[in-house]
Amino acid sequence: MESDNMKKALIAMSGGVDSSVAAYLMKEHGYDCIGVTMKLFQNEDAGVSRKKSCCSLDDVEDARNVCYRMGIRYYVFNFSERFKEDVMDRFVDAYEHGATPNPCIDCNRYLKFDKMFQRMRELEYDYIVTGHYARVEYDEEKNRYLLKKAVDDTKDQSYVLYMLTQEQLAHISPVSYTH
């Protein structure tokens, strides 16, 4: 039974080991967890055939299975229209103008963090937990949250989270912060 003061964590599930471990750790620490994955493509076959794809149907199924085994509710957020507008259209435009675009950075900025945080607030959850290796600490002297490298330098992914606002940093828990 969930208590009214139980902290709630929305787990950004990629279907991989790191986000699965993050979900497990948060559940073990007594959080009310839900797992979520972003649907990014209108075409159901898009991204499925590649071994290292992002948010493919295989990834969704893997994340769903992990959540089922842990007894965590699971949802897929359909961000396919936003993905086309905020990531793919920007990618094509930049490429046509001779730039070297990075669609993963735009996806992180506009979808994974912006839209996911919006959903977190709508669902009245306290944190977004990711499988990224980084740390977030509050510095009382500076009166702000600091994004720091992971404890293990070889796995550091703090660069992925560089664009987070102070409000977002206050509500994110990367995997290396969950231990």
Regions found by a protein language model. Name each.
Residues 1-163, 173:
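ATP-dependent adenylation/nucleotidyltransferase module used to activate substrates
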Residues 170:
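Active-site oxyanion-binding pockets that recognize sulfate/phosphate
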Residues 178-179:
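Conserved small/polar residues in nucleotide/adenosyl-binding loops
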